[in-house]
Amino acid sequence: MNPNQRIITIGSVSLTISTICFFMQIAILITTVTLHFKQYEFNSPPNNQVMLCEPTIIERNITEIVYLTNTTIEKEICPKPAEYRNWSKPQCGITGFAPFSKDNSIRLSAGGDIWVTREPYVSCDLDKCYQFALGQGTTLNNVHSNNTVRDRTPYRTLLMNELGVPFHLGTKQVCIAWSSSSCHDGKAWLHVCITGDDKNATASFIYNGRLVDSVVSWSNDILRTQESECVCINGTCTVVMTDGNATGKADTKILFIEEGKIVHTSKLSGSAQHVEECSCYPRYPGVRCVCRDNWKGSNRPIIDINIKDHSIVSRYVCSGLVGDTPRKSDSSSSSHCLNPNNEKGDHGVKGWAFDDGNDVWMGRTINETSRLGYETFKVVEGWSNPKSKLQINRQVIVDRGDRSGYSGIFSVEGKSCINRCFYVELIRGRKEETEVLWTSNSIVVFCGTSGTYGTGSWPDGADLNLMHI
């Protein structure tokens, strides 16, 4: 074989080997890709199949993405199921109250579209707190705001915003209502909404955005409820409702509600003579309410609600310093643990108090006859002793000369204890301020603290000369 033939032969063999290697590499690549997708088919559901997490109530979807070489694997982590609240933690020990929130609704109304409201309150779900109020179907800068001093019209609706967000035009109208209560059971919101004719009103029970139950007026005389948060323990929510004479004998019932359905109704029992507008708080394993006696007493009624057997016990806050308005001066007032004190009991205002061992924390107007100013304090042995008048840790929330209004309690669960908070309604306009034709409010909110705190006053602050008439 001559040199040229040898070179051609070697070249041909090399080309053949290279070609074989090339096809082998292609075969290896095809095999690798095929095996990869075969494995994906075995480990993944068909495209039209949905993988469901159990249980079906999901609060948050969390997608964890893990990068492995050049492969992306998405793994859905099923969240913990939502659970009913049980409020079994102890009450937080506090030294007083610290500022928490103020919405400045009336001041903002001078330059924007803010709802006309009254009867505000605050309630919290597991993550956030919300402010509620009964709207009048109009903004303040609107001629429809004239004569909104009226309590009950078909245009009133329950408004709901995150706490600190004034009720602007984008605010959600939860339901039709001129009296209401709301609470979160750990899974969803319950709203109790009353509207209709004075002598034949309807209470609608809305749970998780759906109407579940309803009840009609049972005494045909302005069915009404708390105007503050209800309380849910282990899936059972309680709400206090009254129908009947506003300054005489009325018919009060406590409704037990599960996921919006009325499961039991108990009549008021015990020594409370007249009960309206209760401010309720969890006192595990039951619920405790401090209410308004609009008939006989300037001392406030107490209702203890047993969730398990539906029994009801009622009496009055013992403290010799009483919490309603109007009332006698502190030097001349008296109280009774079982009965109304029969001191300026006719009329009143929604308020709150809560027990702290044998002591009692309470809030009230500073003025003894009208809704002016607001103060809080602790009465030593005020939960157990009707002669107790030792006041400590007093704070001024609103100065004596500035208007206040309704007030109520709400509870916030922390990591180790349950804190008590309160709000104060700051009413402006008619009847007292006749330079305008409307009636509305803003709110200020404080929460219990174990720390230190200073002094101040937090009135509504709007200059009515700058407002729409």
Question: What are these language model-derived features?
Answer:
Residues 200-202, 249-253, 298-303, 371-377:
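Structural motif
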Residues 165-167, 213-216, 264-267, 314, ...:
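A short beta-strand motif characteristic of beta-propeller blades
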Residues 97, 119-120, 173, 177-181, ...:
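Repeated scaffold domains used in trafficking and secretory/extracellular systems
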Residues 196, 241-246:
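Short beta-strand-plus-loop segments that form exposed binding edges in beta-rich domains
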Residues 4-39:
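Single-pass membrane-anchoring alpha-helices
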Residues 52-77, 174:
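Serine/threonine-rich low-complexity intrinsically disordered regions
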Residues 76, 289-291:
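Extracellular cysteine-rich, disulfide-stabilized repeat modules
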Residues 61, 70, 86, 146, ...:
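N-linked glycosylation sites
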